[in-house]
Amino acid sequence: MCVDCVEKEYPNRGNICLESGSFLLNFTGCAVCNKRDFMLITNKSLKEEDGEEIVTYDHLCKNCHHVIARHEYTFSIMDEFQEYTMLCLLCGKAEDTISILPDDPRQMTLLF
């Protein structure tokens, strides 16, 4: 992973969890070949462990194949919620939780 290729290391992305793709706005250019171009996604893998899906892949410079960052995305179901996380030097860090029920219990108002 190369901190010289990104504007900000692990930017906070709130609840935007990417299973694929690249956050190009954070890419300043390849520190090896000095070009700012699209990236390749390589070594993509999907593993399932204990009900959790883990997607990992590498962001590579399209021109010189320099490894810019390693991307990790996870998905799991906990009780009545889907939980997503993302951790990547380039794309950032993020978490999101979404209810699988028609009405989100966190959004219910108390009727007293």
UniProtKB/Swiss-Prot annotation:
<feature type="binding site">
    <location>
        <position position="5"/>
    </location>
    <ligand>
        <name>Zn(2+) 1</name>
    </ligand>
</feature>
<feature type="binding site">
    <location>
        <position position="64"/>
    </location>
    <ligand>
        <name>Zn(2+) 2</name>
    </ligand>
</feature>
<feature type="binding site">
    <location>
        <position position="59"/>
    </location>
    <ligand>
        <name>Zn(2+) 3</name>
    </ligand>
</feature>
<comment type="function">
    <text>Transcriptional activator that mediates FGF signaling during neural development. Plays a role in the regulation of cell movement. Does not bind DNA by itself.</text>
</comment>
<keyword id="KW-0805">Transcription regulation</keyword>
<feature type="binding site">
    <location>
        <position position="61"/>
    </location>
    <ligand>
        <name>Zn(2+) 2</name>
    </ligand>
</feature>
<keyword id="KW-0010">Activator</keyword>
<feature type="binding site">
    <location>
        <position position="30"/>
    </location>
    <ligand>
        <name>Zn(2+) 1</name>
    </ligand>
</feature>
<dbReference type="InterPro" id="IPR009508">
    <property type="entry name" value="Transcrpt_activator_Churchill"/>
</dbReference>
<feature type="binding site">
    <location>
        <position position="91"/>
    </location>
    <ligand>
        <name>Zn(2+) 3</name>
    </ligand>
</feature>
<keyword id="KW-0217">Developmental protein</keyword>
<feature type="binding site">
    <location>
        <position position="2"/>
    </location>
    <ligand>
        <name>Zn(2+) 1</name>
    </ligand>
</feature>
<feature type="binding site">
    <location>
        <position position="71"/>
    </location>
    <ligand>
        <name>Zn(2+) 3</name>
    </ligand>
</feature>
<dbReference type="GO" id="GO:0008270">
    <property type="term" value="F:zinc ion binding"/>
</dbReference>
<feature type="binding site">
    <location>
        <position position="66"/>
    </location>
    <ligand>
        <name>Zn(2+) 1</name>
    </ligand>
</feature>
<dbReference type="Pfam" id="PF06573">
    <property type="entry name" value="Churchill"/>
</dbReference>
<keyword id="KW-0862">Zinc</keyword>
<feature type="binding site">
    <location>
        <position position="33"/>
    </location>
    <ligand>
        <name>Zn(2+) 2</name>
    </ligand>
</feature>
<comment type="similarity">
    <text>Belongs to the Churchill family.</text>
</comment>
<feature type="binding site">
    <location>
        <position position="88"/>
    </location>
    <ligand>
        <name>Zn(2+) 3</name>
    </ligand>
</feature>
<dbReference type="InterPro" id="IPR038543">
    <property type="entry name" value="Churchill_sf"/>
</dbReference>
<dbReference type="GO" id="GO:0008543">
    <property type="term" value="P:fibroblast growth factor receptor signaling pathway"/>
</dbReference>
<feature type="binding site">
    <location>
        <position position="30"/>
    </location>
    <ligand>
        <name>Zn(2+) 2</name>
    </ligand>
</feature>
<keyword id="KW-0479">Metal-binding</keyword>
<keyword id="KW-0804">Transcription</keyword>
<dbReference type="GO" id="GO:0045893">
    <property type="term" value="P:positive regulation of DNA-templated transcription"/>
</dbReference>
<protein>
    <recommendedName>
        <fullName>Protein Churchill</fullName>
    </recommendedName>
</protein>
